[in-house]
A protein has these predicted regions:
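Hydrophobic mid-bilayer segments of alpha-helices in multi-pass membrane transport proteins
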Residues: 1, 9-29, 51-58, 90, ...
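Interfacial loop-to-helix junctions that mark the boundaries of transmembrane helices
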Residues: 4-16, 41-45, 79-84, 175-176, ...
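Core transmembrane alpha-helical segments of multi-pass membrane transporters/permeases
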Residues: 11-19, 27, 35-72, 270-310, ...
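Juxtamembrane helix-boundary/capping and inter-helix hinge elements in multi-pass membrane proteins
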Residues: 30-33, 44-48, 125-129, 154-174, ...
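Membrane-interfacial loop-to-helix junctions in multi-pass transporters
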Residues: 45-51, 76-94, 122-131, 217-223, ...
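Hydrophobic alpha-helical transmembrane segments of multi-pass integral membrane proteins
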Residues: 52-61, 83-116, 316-357, 362-363, ...
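Alpha-helical transmembrane segments of multi-pass membrane proteins
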Residues: 86-99, 125-142, 325-338, 365-384, ...
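Juxtamembrane and boundary regions of transmembrane helices in multi-pass small-molecule transporters
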Residues: 137-139, 144-213, 383-436
Length: 436
């Protein structure tokens, strides 16, 4: 939490802080051997290991899609549809959402989409702050609804059934969440279309704009939507993610190679002892997040095994008389976690999950409903916080772009408080659902 508030969303430091926290915790424990044994149990937690393996596969899958120029294909489509200004801003939201829906990676979407959509959007007359908000919102849409996203996986697998073994099924949770997502999704498109245009004049000439747009187009990139559609369809129908994702990788590789979008060397190559390509790059991009997940899960397991969570649930649930009160408590508690821990939206999801599960079971809430409260709350206001990981990543990409292109405007971190429409609207939709 402290690192988030000082804009130090560095994964290595967060991992180090977690390890230091575990060491400090040992000082307050009577049986230190048992303490570390419990930590090892937490590190090997089945939920954590399931997420780790899926994330590694997702890392490879998402990198292959980027190598296949999916982004360039989407930009080509927007140009052919004559999208500019507000229309392009709405399209940026849709394209970002499509990419995030395919990969399930919010940060990966921001990192992949910003270098392409942001400069082109500025050229076409988009309001820079609103355009950035559209990219983040699209990323959050995919992270919230994609069957392969870490948010969907963690929020579902952490909510257990009361009367039988197992956790909330991912496919069922996604289907149940759609009725909340659709109103927020449509409202966001309308708002980005209304507020996406800029009143200022463009600072570049038409020739430069035409050259820049032309250099980031490839209609063949749209072919990479084929594996995307297959993965989403299989996952929603209930197929195991360990089956759907490898199928997506195989299809994406085949499509990319046949269409000439990339070669075998783009997937894996060794030059002068240096390994490169989509396969090692995809795994490397997920390693730190996976390690951080394991550390945080082990810390959460300590809270549960110590009896602290049971005592906290007992105190919080004493005055709960009706189901709606439990739903409000779960939703607001998860929201508070998302704001306090904004560096990575998966972390508040993991931290709040045990308490949400305990309170929800006591109030006899279905695991699907609990998972949706958790996923929506943890993918809400943290997206637009000035110290949040999404905003910091977006600004980092924009600043890198602006160093070589004077026409690219760099918004202030606080500008996104009012432009990340989708996650905020979705939070309101869920809040209203609790009321009704």
């Amino acid at each position: 939490i402290g690192l988030s508030f000082v804009n130090a969303a560095d994964l290595n430091m967060m991992i180090a802080s977690g390890v230091i926290g575990l060491i400090i915790g040992m000082l307050f424990c009577k049986n230190k051997d048992m303490y570390w044994e419990r930590i090892l149990v937490g590190l090997g937690d089945k939920m954590a290991m399931t997420a780790v393996l899926i994330w590694l596969i997702v890392g490879i899958y998402g990198t292959i899609l980027r190598k296949g120029q999916l982004v360039e294909g989407l930009v080509w489509l927007s140009v052919r549809l004559h999208l500019s200004g507000s229309a392009f801003c709405a399209a940026a939201f849709l394209f970002s959402a499509a990419f995030a829906l395919a990969t399930g990676a919010a940060f990966g979407t921001v990192a992949a989409m910003t270098p392409i959509l942001y400069p082109v959007g500025v050229i076409m007359g988009c309001n820079p702050a609103v355009l950035g908000g559209a990219i983040i919102s699209g990323a959050l849409f995919g992270d919230n609804i994609a069957p392969v996203s870490d948010t969907t996986i963690v929020s579902s697998t952490g909510q257990l059934y009361s009367k039988r073994s197992g956790s909330a099924e991912i496919g069922g949770t996604v289907r149940d969440r759609v009725k909340y997502v659709i109103p927020a999704f449509i409202s966001s498109i309308i708002l980005y279309f209304i507020f996406g245009g800029t009143s200022g004049s463009l600072r570049i000439g038409a020739a430069v704009a035409e050259t820049l747009v032309a250099s980031h187009q490839n209609p063949a990139g749209l072919l990479m939507m084929i594996p995307t559609i297959i993965v989403i369809g299989m996952a929603v129908k209930g197929h195991n993610l360990f089956v759907t994702l490898p199928v997506g990788i195989i299809v994406a590789t085949g499509v990319g190679l046949i269409a000439g979008l990339f070669g075998f060397n783009d997937l894996f190559s060794i030059q002068n002892g240096i390994v490169s390509g989509a396969l090692p790059t995809g795994v490397a991009g997920m390693l730190n997040v996976c390690i951080l997940l394991m550390v945080v899960v082990s810390m959460g397991d300590l809270l549960i095994s110590s009896g602290y969570m049971e005592e906290l649930v007992e105190k919080l649930s004493k005055n709960i008389k009706i189901t709606r009160q439990a739903e409000f408590l779960i939703f607001l508690f998860s929201t508070a976690f998302s704001v306090l821990i904004s560096a990575i939206n998966t972390i508040p999801n993991i931290c709040a999950s045990p308490l949400v599960n305990a309170l929800g079971q006591k109030a006899k809430l279905h695991p699907y409903r609990r998972a949706n409260f958790l996923a929506v709350a943890c993918d809400s206001f943290n997206a637009c916080m000035p110290f949040g990981g999404s905003v910091l990543l977006l600004l980092g990409c924009i600043k890198t772009l602006s160093a070589d292109a004077a026409y690219i405007a760099v918004p202030a971190p606080s500008d996104f408080l009012a432009t990340c429409f989708y996650p905020c609207i979705l939070w309101v939709v869920m809040f209203v659902a609790i009321l009704t």
